Curated annotation (Swiss-Prot):
Gene3D superfamilies: 1.10.10.2690. It comes from Escherichia coli. This is TrfB transcriptional repressor protein. Signal peptide: none annotated. Residues 37-56 bind DNA. InterPro entries: Fimbrial_Adhesin_Reg, TrfB. One of its GO terms (molecular function) is DNA binding. In conjunction with KorB, inhibits the transcription of kilA, trfA and korAB operons. In conjunction with KorC is responsible for the negative control of kilC and kilE operons. Keywords: DNA-binding, Plasmid, Repressor, Transcription, Transcription regulation.
Length: 100
């Protein structure tokens, strides 16, 4: 599965990150526009690792963002209650997935 973000998700992810414009341009190109990382390796003369790191920084930041109306919780529960909470989490994730 390719890593992709909408422009709005991308903007939220980079807010507060201390990254340069080149990193932003690379990450937007790959994550929002769907361009291959190899394109940036060639056009900018960077290593594969440098391009991958630029994309990974923004992708990791995006993973920390919660959808509006959601809250991250940590709890210690009896096994049967934990099972129920995990089902709720799976249902919520499914509802957030874009429809194909």
């Amino acid at each position: 599965m390719k890593k992709r973000l909408t422009e709005a998700q991308f903007q939220t992810a980079i807010k507060g990150l201390e990254i340069g414009q080149q990193t932003i341009d690379i990450a937007r190109g790959v994550l929002v526009d769907g361009r291959p990382q190899a394109e940036f390796v060639t056009s900018l003369g960077l290593t594969k690792g440098a391009v991958s790191q630029a994309v990974s920084r923004v992708w990791a930041a995006a993973g920390e963002q919660l959808p509006e109306g959601f809250e991250r919780v940590t709890a210690v529960l009896p096994e049967h209650q934990a099972f129920i909470v995990k089902k709720w989490e799976a249902d919520a994730k499914r509802k957030q997935e874009p429809k194909s």
